[in-house]
């Protein structure tokens, strides 16, 4: 579905409090990937998940699961919109929504605006369709607010040319840069893209990421003259994840334990521990 460097990028995004939306058509694997990436959220974070059907498992200690309820009438029903509004009063560090479909998107943007990252799935097959749905009726997000959403992951079920089998792949990972009111256009950077011929992921490379250089590097205290360090951090995280796969560490909770060690001692030190043969996923 996704390779190590793209996974490492999502790790940096989620750990740093960026809002990431997993988008695609029906049965494209959106919820599965969202659920898998929850291990990248900071271990001490307070997380609220909101769903119609409880599917998402969050391994964190400070996790509150909220589920909608269908009553006999509108007064006894509890909708996503209601839970999302109520969640803001609980001051979460992260809000996870199973799927955003309608008016609750407006509340999600309010949450992101006040500093609560929202991680969710959304039915859209491209960045253009995502923006079109968000800015059109009935959601009607103002165009100038769109860059409050940091990152859009576009997924699809695809038939591989080499085998003819149906697989799920991330088609692209995109950074939302902003809205140009003069040109009336939205600017975004396709940082990762999937090549169907080779079934590999293409990363645009150093110097191409708006979020890494202008948000996350600053948050981590990296000055502009040393901005290459954020790409080195990305590379270290990718190698760390590759080593876990090489050692057969595929269980969700084992990966979570390994990521927690990396959070505690630093990714570079955790990588050294793995290379020395330490089984940090058993800690």
Predicted segments with their positions:
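Switch/coupling sub-region of P-loop NTPases
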Residues: 3, 7-26, 32-158
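Short, Lys/Arg-enriched charge-dense amphipathic segments
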Residues: 43-52, 71-75, 118-125, 149, ...
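Generic amphipathic alpha-helical segments used as scaffolds and interaction surfaces in large
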Residues: 121, 136, 228-231, 246-249
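Generic secondary-structure transition motif, activating predominantly at the C-termini of alpha-helices
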Residues: 135-138, 153, 181, 220, ...
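Conserved P-loop NTPase
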Residues: 151-241
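Terminal-proximal interaction/regulatory segments of ATP-powered molecular machines
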Residues: 232-283
